Amino acid sequence: MIPAAYPTREEIARLTARMLLEIGAVNFNTKEPYILASGLPSPSYIDCRKLISFPRIRSTLMDFLTVTVMRNAGFEAFDNIAGGETAGIPFAALVAERMALPMTYVRKKPKGYGRNARIEGAMSEGQRVLLVEDLTTDGGSKLSFVDAIRETGASCGHTAVIFYYDIFPETEKTLGDHGVALHYLCTWWDVLAEARAQKAFDEVTLSGVEAFLKDPRAWQAANKR
């Protein structure tokens, strides 16, 4: 049951951003940009994995993620909660516990043979699976996990993340074209607003990050090394 006292979507976004800032998960550096897995530079980087070491914040955000999924998708919409290797595993376990559902995880690469070679745990044909991850940038890695789940004969039409970059306009369309709805707690825009409110970084840095968020590809082209 969702208690009436649960915060609104907007309040969840603000509180999530505040908590991520509090634990030092948010990193801004416009002078020495971070290099993403794609090889492109970024003045912002977030480490949601740090959440597992902060039990009070971790518990609150998992409550938020669970209620967000239930509000958006329904109370009886799933039969199995799957985490993506490796960052999604602890969060999937915590959500599964709250929803009283079985938990599995999806490997990045197959182990063994057969259509369940990428699945650890018990996943059955026909089950409705929610994929849980820490974050998503362009949605690409989610589709790989979704495909692995569907190969078992289960269905997967929803993915839930703590953090969504929300700077690449094609992300939700890419997921939607594959029949996947995205649920999330907060975005870079929420973090930027909260960081400004807290004066967590100097205004030069915040303005530089804002320029990146408004046009990431142009910023990356100008700052490519």
From Swiss-Prot:
Binding site for 5-phospho-alpha-D-ribose 1-diphosphate: R107, K108, K111, E133, D134, L135, T136, T137, D138, G139, G140, S141
GO MF term set: magnesium ion binding; orotate phosphoribosyltransferase activity
Catalysed transformations (reactions): orotidine 5'-phosphate + diphosphate = orotate + 5-phospho-alpha-D-ribose 1-diphosphate
Pathway in which the depicted protein is active: Pyrimidine metabolism; UMP biosynthesis via de novo pathway; UMP from orotate: step 1/2
Organism superkingdom: Bacteria
Free-text function comment from the UniProt entry: Catalyzes the transfer of a ribosyl phosphate group from 5-phosphoribose 1-diphosphate to orotate, leading to the formation of orotidine monophosphate (OMP).
Family: Belongs to the purine/pyrimidine phosphoribosyltransferase family. PyrE subfamily.
Name of the protein in its database record: Orotate phosphoribosyltransferase
Lineage, uppermost ranks: Bacteria, Pseudomonadati, Pseudomonadota, Alphaproteobacteria, Rhodobacterales
